[in-house]
């Protein structure tokens, strides 16, 4: 395996570990009485601000994009990233971390399959083996094979999260080589935050957002959710695809 390929595999594994921490932070926030809509808004908005500040301070030129590419960035953020975060949060709350992990880890498999169908990438025996082993491993470690009771809504949210993330990857597949991972992340977080704000306001959930911002424990957990499970995970996975 080439050095670049090894680095990409390691980054995907680290991204998976970051995604796996979702349940820890979500369970803490749930104990504070925070719902998925509220924590998703704080998560996406805070990460948009942080990535924006980072780019403005380090590489301001990276904030410039071709306006024609908004046709890719808007749905990637508003649909792919926002709905992914929202659906995955609800899935964890309804079916628990183990089962939600099985469902969400379908997304690399879906990305691979969609890439073969829509982007005409080669489906090799190695990819097929990785696909089978990843799905089998998720099922074994989650306890699904041991008779876990599944909530239909939680399963639907988990599958929806996997599909949304697949959509995000397909939409950006032709743009990842053009922009840096941080540029992609900033605009995805930005449009995800806008979509989340509209959704949260329409649902009448903004008072809950104010509660998070004024409660140190809830705010710390929400920032951890954003930094580890959104920023770090997304950057690692996006960088791996670029590699």
Question: Predicted regions: what is each one?
Answer:
Residues 24-36, 62-63, 93, 141-153, ...:
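Membrane-interface helix termini and inter-helical loops of multi-pass transporters
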Residues 23, 52-98, 104, 140, ...:
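Specific transmembrane alpha-helical segments of multi-pass solute transporters/efflux pumps
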């Amino acid at each position: 395996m080439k050095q670049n390929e090894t680095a990409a595999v390691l980054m995907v594994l680290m991204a998976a570990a970051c995604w796996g921490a979702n349940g820890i932070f979500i369970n803490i926030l749930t104990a504070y009485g925070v719902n998925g809509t509220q924590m998703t808004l704080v998560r996406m908005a805070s990460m948009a601000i942080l990535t924006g500040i980072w780019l403005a301070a380090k590489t301001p030129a990276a904030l410039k994009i071709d306006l024609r590419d908004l046709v890719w960035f808007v749905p990637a953020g508003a649909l792919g990233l926002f709905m992914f975060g929202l659906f995955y949060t609800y899935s964890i709350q309804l079916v628990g971390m183990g089962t939600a992990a099985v469902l969400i880890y379908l997304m690399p498999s879906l990305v691979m399959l969609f890439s073969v169908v829509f982007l005409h990438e080669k489906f090799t025996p190695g990819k097929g083996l990785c696909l089978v082993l990843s799905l089998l491993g998720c099922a074994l470690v989650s306890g699904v094979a041991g008779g876990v009771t599944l909530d239909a809504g939680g399963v639907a949210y988990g599958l929806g999260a996997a599909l949304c993330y697949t959509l995000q990857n397909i939409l950006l597949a032709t743009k990842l080589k053009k922009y840096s991972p941080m540029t992609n992340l900033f605009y995805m977080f930005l449009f995800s935050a806008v979509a989340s704000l509209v959704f949260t306001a329409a649902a009448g959930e903004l008072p809950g957002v104010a509660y998070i911002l004024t409660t140190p424990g809830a705010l710390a957990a929400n920032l951890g959710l954003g930094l580890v499970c959104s920023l770090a995970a997304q950057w690692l996975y996006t960088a791996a695809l670029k590699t």
